[in-house]
């Protein structure tokens, strides 16, 4: 006899397993994202608990390649509230990112071009693992931001006009 599964329960479980934990919305405004890469992140236990509680800030973060390894700098993960001061982590410590060697080499080749940088875009759950999506971005000038805003406004007006008719 076939199983009569509860589709709503499985969809909810799948959504919980792929939950967004922190997002860097400012990065998409300040940079034109050319390429993205999902990486693992090396964390200690209190960092995991703080991230799952939504206590991570990616706004000022950036990534570097040092000694052939990807490193995440300047990302603030608040100390866990229930751990003592001795067992807690340093909120701004440098964290190692986990990626394949060929992916790191590809990023290094692209970073040699002028004006490109690696920025963290979001922290999310993938199953029980915390993953970080990093983006290869090119900084936007003020006039680029204005043009983008004008284009978005025009698209909104067109959609609203089409919705009326």
From Swiss-Prot:
Keywords: Cytoplasm, RNA-binding. The keyword Ribosomal protein does not apply. It holds the Pfam family SmpB. GO terms for biological process: trans-translation. Residues 141-165 are annotated as: Disordered. Its main location: cytoplasm. One of its GO terms (cellular component) is cytosol. Residues 145-159 have a biased composition (Basic and acidic residues). It is found in: Cytoplasm. The keyword Ubl conjugation does not apply. GO terms for molecular function: RNA binding. PANTHER family: SSRA-BINDING PROTEIN, TMRNA-BINDING COMPONENT OF TRANS-TRANSLATION TAGGING COMPLEX. Required for rescue of stalled ribosomes mediated by trans-translation. Binds to transfer-messenger RNA (tmRNA), required for stable association of tmRNA with ribosomes. tmRNA and SmpB together mimic tRNA shape, replacing the anticodon stem-loop with SmpB. tmRNA is encoded by the ssrA gene; the 2 termini fold to resemble tRNA(Ala) and it encodes a 'tag peptide', a short internal open reading frame. During trans-translation Ala-aminoacylated tmRNA acts like a tRNA, entering the A-site of stalled ribosomes, displacing the stalled mRNA. HAMAP family: SmpB (MF_00023). Belongs to the SmpB family. This is SsrA-binding protein. It comes from Prochlorococcus marinus (strain MIT 9313). The lineage of its organism: Bacteria, Bacillati, Cyanobacteriota, Cyanophyceae, Synechococcales. The gene is smpB.
């Amino acid at each position: 006899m076939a199983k009569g599964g509860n589709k709503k329960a499985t969809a909810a479980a799948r959504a919980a397993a792929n939950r967004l934990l922190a997002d860097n919305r400012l990065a998409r405004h300040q940079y034109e994202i050319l390429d993205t890469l999902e990486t693992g992140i090396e964390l200690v236990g209190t960092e995991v608990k703080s991230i799952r509680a939504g206590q991570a800030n990616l706004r000022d973060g950036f990534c570097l390649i040092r000694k052939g390894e990807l490193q995440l700098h300047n990302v603030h993960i608040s100390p866990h509230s229930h751990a003592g001061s001795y067992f807690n982590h340093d909120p701004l410590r440098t964290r190692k990112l986990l990626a394949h060697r060929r992916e790191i080499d590809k990023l290094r080749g692209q970073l040699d071009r002028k004006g490109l940088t690696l920025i963290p875009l979001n922290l999310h759950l993938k199953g029980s693992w915390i993953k970080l999506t990093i983006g290869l971005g090119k900084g936007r000038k003020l006039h680029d931001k204005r043009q983008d805003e004008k284009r978005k406004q025009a698209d909104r007006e067109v959609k609203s006009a089409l919705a009326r008719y």
